[in-house]
Amino acid sequence: MERALIRQEISKACKRLALTQQVVTMCELEATPRQEEFLYQVLSQELAYRERLRRERLLKRAAFPVRKTLDDYEWTALRLPAALPAEDVTSCNFVRMKRNLILYGPVGTGKTHLAIALGVAACEAGLETRFFTAASLATKLDEARRSGNLEKLLQSIDRAELVILDEWGYLPLEKEQAQLLFQLISSCYERRSLIITTNLSLIHI
């Protein structure tokens, strides 16, 4: 790698690591090309290490019941609308564009697997994600409301760029729970992406 390019990469790495540009200045004044190459490798390894830690934190906060990947998903059961290319789904572009997915079909068609796999992919892409079953989230919201902690819970969810609601319609909800859940969904509109899995037909969602 050319020396000028190495210095550019060192400068970028310093910014990402929140280091001052004094490192770059010292390189330009005192370091040999070999020393600059070594420093570049050290900074690159530190960046990679921090990125791995960040992904693990995102995966932990997402609270997936299990971890699934897109590699072992059976794609033959999936039909996407023409307006949503598969690339936008697998690359998580739909999250960046704040678009929503409703995965519906009979039990055993891999809806939850795909939802979790997309959530894992989003975390690996650095996107804050939260996973809930619809019933568990409704219960959490209701309990938080009763205990006066609703705002705190909503703020936690508000940090997410992707919210996954699994098993929509699987269990009946109390009126207050349903209202809180619908309010949350409404607040997500054009602000973050939702993935909802359900075995209900669209007219019943």
Predicted regions: what they are:
Residues 127-128, 159-162, 190-196:
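Loop/turn-to-beta-strand initiation segments
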Residues 203-205:
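Conserved small/polar residues in nucleotide/adenosyl-binding loops
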Residues 100-112:
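Walker A/P-loop nucleotide-binding motif
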Residues 71-89:
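N-terminal pre-Walker A segment at the start of P-loop NTPase domains
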Residues 82-84, 130-157:
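Short glycine-rich substrate-engagement loop in P-loop NTPases that contacts/grips substrate
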Residues 91-98:
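Phosphate-binding P-loop
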Residues 109-127:
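Walker A/P-loop
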Residues 16-65:
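Interdomain "pre-motor" coupling segment immediately N-terminal to P-loop NTPase/helicase cores
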